[in-house]
Amino acid sequence: ATRGVCYRTLQHQDSQVNKLEISPDKQILAAAGNPTIKIFEVNASNPSPILTHEGHQGNVTAIGFERDGRWMYSGSDDGTVKLWDARQGSRHTREYESRAAVTTVALHPNGAELLSGDANGNIRVWDLTMNACSCELVPEVGVAVRSVSVASDGSLVVAGNSTGTCYVWRLQKDAKTTAHFEPLHKLRAHPDEYVLKCLISPDVRSLATTSSDKTVKLWNLDGLGLERTLKGHSRWVWDCVFSVDAAYLVTASSDGSARLWDCSSGEAIRVYNGHHKAVVCCALNDSAVDAATG
C-alpha cells in the first residue's frame, strides 16, 4: 500500500464486489458479491476462490469475521443476517430475519452480539447466545441506516444514515449485553447527503465518515468536533478503513480510485488507480501493509 503498486489482481466474474474483509490471521480475503461470498487465499498465487458461501438470495452488503476467524457473518438485500463456518463452503449455520434489506452489520467486541442496520431505518441487536433479537432502535423512521460501527472497547455505537446524520450512543458500562443504549449525539456529518460509511478508529479517538458529497471527514469522538475534511475524490466515497494504529485511512470511491491518507495532516499520500469502474470497498492488511480494493 505504501508503494502504490498493484502486484496482484483477483477476478470476481460473477458479479460486482460489494464488500471486502481480511481474516484476523491475514490468510484469507472474503469478497461479498451477488449473491455469494467468495474466499481467496491472500498469500497464494491461486487467482481462483478456494471456497464459495451460497445461501443469500440477493446482494451481500456486509461481511466480517469473528476475532478468531472461525466463523463469518453477512447481511444481504434479501433481508437476512447469516453466520457461516469460515473454513468450509457449506451453507450458513444460522440465519436471522430482518424484515427489510440489510445494509450493514457489525460485530460487538464481546463476540456474542451482532448489530444490523436496514433500509427501513431499523438497528437490531442479535444475541447469538439467545439466538434472537434482544434490542431494536429506530433513529429516524423510514430513513435507511447505511453504516454501523462499534468501538473496539465496546463503549460506543455510531450509525450513519441517508440524511447525512450520524447517531452516537454510549453502551452501558460493564454490561454483558448491549441492550442499554444511552443517546449521546446527533451529528449532522454530511447535511442533505448520504453517509455511506461511518467507522470508529481502533484507538476509539476518532470517527471517520464517508459520503456522497465526495468528502471524508474525521471527527474527534470527545465532543465530536470536526478535525479534518479529506478532499480529493471526485465522486462518492463508499468505504474506508483505518490502519491498526489509526494513523492512516484508506478510502474507496466511484471515481475509480482508492487513496491512502495521513490522518494527522489530512493529506493523501498515495492514490491507487487501475480500476476501470467505481471502487466501492476496501480492506487493509496491516501485517504486510497491503490494501485490497474492489
Positions of PLM-derived features:
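WD40-repeat beta-propellers
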Residues: 1, 37-42, 81-85, 123-126, ...
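Conserved strand-to-loop turn within each blade of WD40 beta-propeller repeats
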Residues: 32-34, 75-78, 117-120, 160-163, ...
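A structural motif specific to WD40 beta-propellers
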Residues: 5-8, 48-51, 91-94, 134-135, ...
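WD40/WD-repeat beta-propeller blade N-cap
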Residues: 11-17, 54-60, 96-102, 138-145, ...
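Core solenoid repeat modules with strong leucine/isoleucine-rich periodicity
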Residues: 98-101, 107-109, 114, 119, ...
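Residue-level detector of Asp-centered blade-edge/turn motifs that repeat once per structural unit
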Residues: 24-25, 67-68, 109-110, 152-153, ...
